[in-house]
Amino acid sequence: MKYRRVLLKLSGEALMGDREFGIDPEVVKSLAGEIARVVEAGTELAVVVGGGNIFRGVKASSSGMDRATADYVGMLATVMNALTLQDALEQQFQVQTRLLSAIEMKEVAEPFIRRRAMRHLEKGRVVIFGAGSGNPFFTTDTTAALRAAEIDAQVIFKATRVDGIYDSDPKFNPQAVRFEKITFHEVLVQNLRVMDSTAIALCRENNIPILVFNVFEKNSIYRAVQGEAVGTYVC
């Protein structure tokens, strides 16, 4: 086992599968199964979930909505996704989980307390972080970098729809080249949009590498934990 403690960043879009909006139960079940396998193998796993399948604060603010308000709505969307993932893990795979929210909502989640999160991980529970960082103007990518630093994660797995980072968009350029390994500096200089610049800066300052890979490839999360060559490694 290459990694002992991992922070998995799941985009909201990953949860909707081929749909244009919302949550695909079959996709959630598949992801929960992958997570369960990783935990059973002995890796401590925390998850940050996005909310873009339900609401995107940046898009709403560009349409005239107050940016801070839009971001708070987006945070609530992440909690909806987190609850859905939690239910799949517990009901279908009998994996112990804890949902920790950056915004207090004691009826559905524990408040985020760093030491509590780390104790849950040590006990083999999957820790799901909801409500982003609790602050507007910050993305869930930045939340992933922040939480990874706080819980001493060895790596961030950024699970996406593509199999790594390319020098240009492979959707529009068939000759696009995929990087196997790239530095934080190169990501920023080339504006490759792996994560936003705040998240990249946090990872660079705290020496937390990022592995970007296609979450829809079978066993991709498990293979990544084992140290197999999947996706693009950013360090």
UniProtKB/Swiss-Prot annotation:
<dbReference type="InterPro" id="IPR036393">
    <property type="entry name" value="AceGlu_kinase-like_sf"/>
</dbReference>
<dbReference type="GO" id="GO:0005524">
    <property type="term" value="F:ATP binding"/>
</dbReference>
<feature type="binding site">
    <location>
        <position position="166"/>
    </location>
    <ligand>
        <name>ATP</name>
    </ligand>
</feature>
<feature type="binding site">
    <location>
        <position position="52"/>
    </location>
    <ligand>
        <name>ATP</name>
    </ligand>
</feature>
<dbReference type="GO" id="GO:0006225">
    <property type="term" value="P:UDP biosynthetic process"/>
</dbReference>
<feature type="binding site">
    <location>
        <begin position="9"/>
        <end position="12"/>
    </location>
    <ligand>
        <name>ATP</name>
    </ligand>
</feature>
<feature type="binding site">
    <location>
        <begin position="133"/>
        <end position="140"/>
    </location>
    <ligand>
        <name>UMP</name>
    </ligand>
</feature>
<feature type="binding site">
    <location>
        <position position="56"/>
    </location>
    <ligand>
        <name>ATP</name>
    </ligand>
</feature>
<comment type="pathway">
    <text>Pyrimidine metabolism; CTP biosynthesis via de novo pathway; UDP from UMP (UMPK route): step 1/1.</text>
</comment>
<dbReference type="Pfam" id="PF00696">
    <property type="entry name" value="AA_kinase"/>
</dbReference>
<dbReference type="InterPro" id="IPR001048">
    <property type="entry name" value="Asp/Glu/Uridylate_kinase"/>
</dbReference>
<comment type="similarity">
    <text>Belongs to the UMP kinase family.</text>
</comment>
<keyword id="KW-0547">Nucleotide-binding</keyword>
<keyword id="KW-0067">ATP-binding</keyword>
<keyword id="KW-0418">Kinase</keyword>
<dbReference type="InterPro" id="IPR015963">
    <property type="entry name" value="Uridylate_kinase_bac"/>
</dbReference>
<dbReference type="InterPro" id="IPR011817">
    <property type="entry name" value="Uridylate_kinase"/>
</dbReference>
<keyword id="KW-0665">Pyrimidine biosynthesis</keyword>
<protein>
    <recommendedName>
        <fullName>Uridylate kinase</fullName>
        <ecNumber>2.7.4.22</ecNumber>
    </recommendedName>
</protein>
<keyword id="KW-0808">Transferase</keyword>
<feature type="binding site">
    <location>
        <position position="169"/>
    </location>
    <ligand>
        <name>ATP</name>
    </ligand>
</feature>
<feature type="binding site">
    <location>
        <position position="71"/>
    </location>
    <ligand>
        <name>UMP</name>
    </ligand>
</feature>
<dbReference type="GO" id="GO:0044210">
    <property type="term" value="P:'de novo' CTP biosynthetic process"/>
</dbReference>
<keyword id="KW-0963">Cytoplasm</keyword>
<feature type="binding site">
    <location>
        <position position="51"/>
    </location>
    <ligand>
        <name>UMP</name>
    </ligand>
</feature>
<comment type="function">
    <text>Catalyzes the reversible phosphorylation of UMP to UDP.</text>
</comment>
<comment type="subunit">
    <text>Homohexamer.</text>
</comment>
<feature type="binding site">
    <location>
        <position position="160"/>
    </location>
    <ligand>
        <name>ATP</name>
    </ligand>
</feature>
<dbReference type="GO" id="GO:0033862">
    <property type="term" value="F:UMP kinase activity"/>
</dbReference>
<dbReference type="GO" id="GO:0005737">
    <property type="term" value="C:cytoplasm"/>
</dbReference>
